[in-house]
Regions:
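N-terminal "arm"/small-domain region of PLP-dependent enzymes with the aminotransferase-like
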Residues: 1-31, 36, 343
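PLP-dependent aminotransferase class I/II
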Residues: 9, 21, 36-43, 48-52, ...
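Structural detector of well-ordered beta-strand residues that form the stable sheet scaffold
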Residues: 55, 80, 101, 154-155, ...
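Conserved SAM-binding loop
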Residues: 63, 85, 91, 343-346
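PLP-dependent aminotransferase-like
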Residues: 69-149, 153-158, 165
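Hydrophobic/aromatic ligand-binding patch that stacks against planar heteroaromatic rings
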Residues: 92-93, 146, 170, 187, ...
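Conserved active-site segment immediately N-terminal to the catalytic lysine
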Residues: 156-191, 206, 218-223
Length: 368
């Protein structure tokens, strides 16, 4: 049996027919940039996420940059980010001339450690970027309270958490701006690069719309610094069709997540990263911590089971960001060293999940 990390083919079968019709209509209209489908997608995303405003952008990375620009992050400002995240969370801050201040994460779920964040807030702190890693949301209610008290922006990098909730609320109900990525492998993925920013603040919304289009407040007239970060109409067409199935897919992911957690929780040799009890995760990833992960992954590969790592290096273990490291940070390094992601996607059958679990137990010589 061969088990893949993701399966994009099954979803394509569902949207193929309607997608072809949309493409033919688009090619006839030739409205490839900010065409009608972009506004339709933004409306659909706002509705499904129960948020007032959505701005479609060209990638998850550009979503963060657009959000930072909208929050007036400038040179020498400090922005607190977790050490365990994708490169762009940190690089977006540096590209604006600001300084990333690195915080540790929690070993239980991989999200940023809020106590560590509080210790790092200074008069120069202008924003905190929380990261909903693996689909797990941090305690955004507590972070929101801190940010309100300190009068700083709260931005959530939700590239992996589309559809996740904390206290039965979506991330943008707590944040100034929430960002997401529609990279193909995401819970809601396009057929290329795309992303979005969500906010309930009209002023920030209007600024982000201008920023994503070279800072133009009207055609050929720039009133603020911006960039070319518009979502293209082709990807909007894809996402409109895929959204029709997203609730069902997230439900199935959550079911699989529960099976993994239930069946693996008794294995002492591994530690399963799990969201806190108030978080309803979207089933983006199943992550375990294990010693000698390469040996384990080679074994799983020999049994036909694909695995992955998110991520092999923390932000400050990489040359670009090495000078921002904090020697007291330990949890993120431990996760980077030992994390293994197991296969999960909405079209995975129960017998396939059972096979993955069976292989893990055999690796540890555990008999039922």
């Amino acid at each position: 049996m061969k088990i893949q990390m993701i399966n994009l083919h099954e979803n394509f079968k569902l949207i193929n027919k309607n997608l072809k019709k949309k493409f033919l209509k688009l090619f006839s209209s030739q409205k490839f940039i900010l065409g009608d489908e972009v506004q339709k997608l933004e409306n659909n995303l706002s509705k499904i996420n129960k948020v007032k405003y959505t701005v479609g952008v060209s990638s998850g990375t550009d979503a963060i940059i657009v959000a930072l620009l909208a929050c007036n992050i400038k040179k020498n400002d400090e922005v607190i980010i977790p050490d365990m995240t994708w490169i762009s969370t940190a690089s977006s801050v540096l590209l604006l001339g600001a300084k990333p201040i690195i915080a540790d994460v929690n070993l239980e779920d991989g999200t940023v450690n809020i106590d560590n964040i509080e210790k790092k807030i200074t008069k120069k702190t202008k924003a905190i970027i929380s990261v909903s890693l693996y689909g797990h949301m941090p305690n955004l209610s507590k972070l929101k309270s801190i940010c309100n008290k300190k009068k700083i922006y709260l931005i959530n990098d939700g590239a992996q958490s589309f559809g996740s909730k904390h206290n039965n609320k979506y991330c943008h109900e707590y944040t100034s701006i929430s960002c997401t990525s529609f990279f193909p492998a995401k819970v809601l993925g396009s057929y290329g690069d795309a992303g979005a920013c969500f906010t309930n603040n009209k002023t920030l919304y209007e600024k982000m719309k201008i920023i994503r289009a070279h800072g133009q407040s009207k055609k050929s007239y720039s009133t603020t610094l911006g960039l070319n970060a518009r979502i293209d109409t082709i990807q909007a067409c894809v996402l409109i069709e895929k959204i029709k199935f997203i609730k069902k897919e997230i439900r199935r992911r959550s079911e699989i997540l529960k099976i993994y957690h239930s069946m693996l929780s008794t294995i002492k040799q591994i530690n399963i990263l799990q969201p806190d009890e108030k978080c309803r995760a979207n089933g983006s990833s199943v992550v375990i911590l294990i010693n000698d992960k390469k040996r384990f992954q080679n074994y799983m590969s020999s049994k036909g089971v694909q695995t992955a790592n998110l991520y092999d290096y923390t932000i400050t273990q990489q040359p670009t960001f090495k000078k921002y490291q904090d020697r007291e940070i330990k949890n993120s390094k431990l996760i980077a060293k030992n994390n293994v992601c197991l296969p999960i996607h909405p079209y995975m059958k129960n017998k396939e999940v059972a096979y993955v679990i069976k292989c893990i137990k055999r690796y540890f010589k555990i008999t039922d």
